[in-house]
Amino acid sequence: GISTAYAKYGAKLIMVDLSPAVEETAEKLRKEYNAEIITVIANVADREQMDAAAAKGVEKFGEINVACCNAGVCRLAPFEEMDDKTRDFHIDVNIKGVWNTCKAVIPYMLKQGGGNIVIASSVTGDIVADAGEAAYAMTKAALVGLTKCLAVEYADRNIRVNCSQLGYARTPMVEKMALESNPENPEAAIADIAVGVPMKRLAKPIEVGELFAFLGSDESSYLTGSQIVIDGGSTLPETMSIGTN
């Protein structure tokens, strides 16, 4: 959704992914939008690989105007059963991955006189919580703090930093979570999620992409350090309340 939105608006893209399948996605965008795209196979948890990815982007396009930090993982497990390896996996991808991306791009942004960073946090951790998601909630809440600190630190140097706080979208990660939750009928798990959303559906990836495109554009030029919730209203209802249907 994010790469599609940026391609639609004419951005030149550096698509970084751990999977070689990213090239297939890139080729579809090239054909549909005539987009200029390079792909880089890299692990966001590896600082050197992210430095190299940013360098390749600058070598190709001359500068980096926007960085979308949207790599993320979620593994479900009761807290007492979650091992340190799983905890560290969340930290490596969800926190260090964003940290490494920011470390890789900010020097270029400073040199060129500014830029935008959009970080994918979540409503989970900072606003709401679910059993079995301790590692995910911890790491996603940390990104809100990182967003605010970077926004303050770089505001006077024309680098804006904002984060999206997504509820549930129909993404591969959510589909994997649904499969873990209900291996026999993952679609039922997704339907159960939608029931709790006032809009009665999950977000479409392109809807999330449009928010990222807005936050990376001059249309949001006075926004920095902001947390933008995109959840179909799922965090609004009270758990216990008296009211009308």
PLM features: what roles do these ranges have?
Residues 1-14:
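Canonical Rossmann dinucleotide-binding motif of NAD(H)/NADP(H)-dependent dehydrogenases/reductases
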Residues 107, 152-156, 221:
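Alpha-helical segment proximal to the catalytic Tyr-Lys
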Residues 163, 185-219, 223, 230-232:
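C-terminal helical subdomain
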Residues 78-79, 83-91, 189, 193:
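Substrate-binding pocket helix/loop in short-chain dehydrogenase/reductase
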Residues 82, 128-137, 149, 177:
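Active-site loop-to-helix junction immediately N-terminal to the catalytic Tyr of the SDR YXXXK motif
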Residues 224-245:
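Short C-terminal tail/terminal secondary-structure segment
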